[in-house]
Amino acid sequence: MIIRAPIRTKTKSFRGDQMDFKFPSNESLPRGTLEEYHLNNHHLLNDVFAAENGVSRDEDGNSQILSDYTSTSNTNTNSGYSSNGYYSFANISDNTTSSPRIVINQNETARLTSSDSNKSDFFASHDFPGNDSLHYSSSSVVKNQLHSMEAIPEGNITGSISTAFQTIPTADNVSYDIAPSSASSLLPRKSTSKSAILPSTQEAKPMTKLNMEKDIKTIELNNSVVPKPKKKLNRVPTIRRVESSRFSNSRYSSSVSSKSSSSRCSLKRSKAIRCKGGLLYYFTSLGIKIKKKLRKLRLVLRRRLFSYNVQKVPSATNSKTTKSKANINNKSKKRGTNLVNKNSNSTPRQKKSQRYVSNLQRSISSKSLVPVLAPQKKTKPLTVDTKFKANHPQSEDSKVGSNTPRSPLVSYTPSLRRTNSSIRRAASILTASATMTPANNKNSFISVPDNVSHAVTRNSSMYSRSRLVRSKPSTALNAIARQPSIVVENKVIPLSMNRYSIKEEDEYVIDTSSMRELSPVNSVCSSDYDRESSESYSNYADAMETTEVDNKDRVECNNEIQNVNANNEETSNEESYNLMKHYLSTVIAQRIMLRVQIARIQNNKSNVVYMNKSAETNSTIYEDLADTLLTEYEADGSSSQIFDGVSVRADEEEEEDEDDEDDEEEEEENDDEEDEEDEEDEEDDEEEEEKRKEGEGRNLAKEVDELAELSPMRKQSDLSITLRSPFAMLNSAYSNSIISLPTGVVKRSLTLPVGMKI
């Protein structure tokens, strides 16, 4: 279709300035270098038009073809009066404003005044030589003087104007006559006045053919004496509309030069619209007619090609009225019950018109409406078959949909066509979210029955109201129950009363019922482990901590643990009692002996005595102690030889040390051993204190004897220390002995490594 539309839109509404763009004008060029003959090329059309029609008069003021683009100013500041050879559709705003009057004085700006505005727009003035008086001449004289490709001269308005009153014979479809805006001023004047007031088109009255010809003759006689410079037209042509394009076509085809004596009404449109030949109205009306015809043709084609499953009447003897009634009934039934004609062959185009999506049948969506449909006999999770055939018996859908109440959501009107982007933005609620809404919820648009079949839900075979609402990806959004909505400017506006109409849904379902099988406290293992793990935080005395602090901490912790573990079995208590009694007796004796040794070595008196003993090797007691500790550490702690001559350290003690150290290493891995060891911390506090006192008395005397009897050959084998820290119990593979040193040297904490070599 050829329908003109505005190209530039950023303009002010009432004769305002262009906001972004200006066409090239005379104001931007040096004055007098270029005239409008060089700025436009419609003079070619003037010559061709004059040659074909043999026009005798100067017709520059007659048509928009000749005089529209050679108006007062080339500036585009007032977009209604010049376009410099371009179309200007910029100001199609209000067609009811009264046309302005132009007051023109020589060597002054052309002033445009309007009755409905206090503004006055000024056009660029054209300087003329002072001695030249302006004139008019017939087009025959001009043709002899000018070249065939030169422009017909156009005159400035300083007096009366000669205009011819005939229509523009550019085509058969022109519907405009050009009426003179200076019709009231076409009176013979003997005095050549320098100014002329042009009345508006509302003031200009239509005049008959005879009166206008008389006026033209008097004007030509008055202006014949004047010399002939180049002229410009400062007049804006007025356009008068003929009745309609139908009559104008017939009239112009009959005779080109015939004038219609019918009454002419002023065309109400803004002066910004300038179309060559005045064909804008014709093309707009033509476009409207073509649109109407195409719409009718489209409806006819859609009825022929995509008939809405009109079933043929079986008997051929029926009348036309019965056929029409049957067609209407069939259409209504089709929209109500069956969306697909089971008997007709379906093409992808027909499927698309009948609400198919990617060759999948629409009936899939009826099966996916779980709350609406009755529970089916087959309890299988619903799956979409991509090889679903169109032809299947009609009884299945009738059985499914006969006894079930219709949901208000399911509407069988043809769905709106949506683009891919609008489908992504569609405010759709999947049926999985509908099953999650409780039945008594006011916001739910589908009432959920209590006896919903558990296996027919879309997303999972388990039906639970507590699961998080997430959905599987569907084959197509049109196969899913959607909210009623309207698509306005490619945006979906929901029509439901839900407060939260759009629910964000992800790809899969998280069933929270599986998370509730375990209690929140005992979420990893059995309850016994939790009780044991709480008990496993038994306090182990650091090697350099005092015994008083250890005893206080153990008494406080053991009192709490006794209350918790009062109900344990008696057999395990007895076994753990015996084990811990043996374990604590050996460990406490070792730690006390180590402290005594270090205290004696650090003492100056004992160092002097011992240095005399070890004078052969020229090494201090500290070097010997370090050597023995390193050898003991590298020997994997299998044997400790600190107490060689002591009767307390027997073979049983060595085995018990190894076993007990392994027990401490594997406390969190082996729960039973941890319980036994921790329980006996409580029961043996009194025995520990007694044994420590006895051990101190015995070991101090024996240690002094051993230190006195040490020889250089026995140093590395006698002094060896093996200690296991409670921090080494996490992983037995990496649990190495930590040697206790004075607090100024090493401060042990949880952040230090498990094993240290000195």
Curated annotation (Swiss-Prot):
Comp. bias (Acidic residues): 651-689
Q: Where does this protein have compositionally biased stretches of type Basic and acidic residues?
A: 690-705
Q: Where is the composition biased (Low complexity)?
A: 315-330
Task: Provide the residue span(s) of the region labelled Disordered.
Answer: 55-77, 314-414, 636-709
Where do Polar residues bias regions lie? Answer: 338-348, 355-368, 400-414
Q: PTM Phosphoserine: list the residues.
A: 25
**What is the similarity comment for this entry?**
Belongs to the AIM44 family.
Name recorded for this polypeptide: Altered inheritance of mitochondria protein 44
What organism does this protein naturally occur in? Saccharomyces cerevisiae (strain AWRI1631) (Baker's yeast)
Please spell out the taxonomic lineage of the organism that makes this protein: Eukaryota, Fungi, Dikarya, Ascomycota, Saccharomycotina
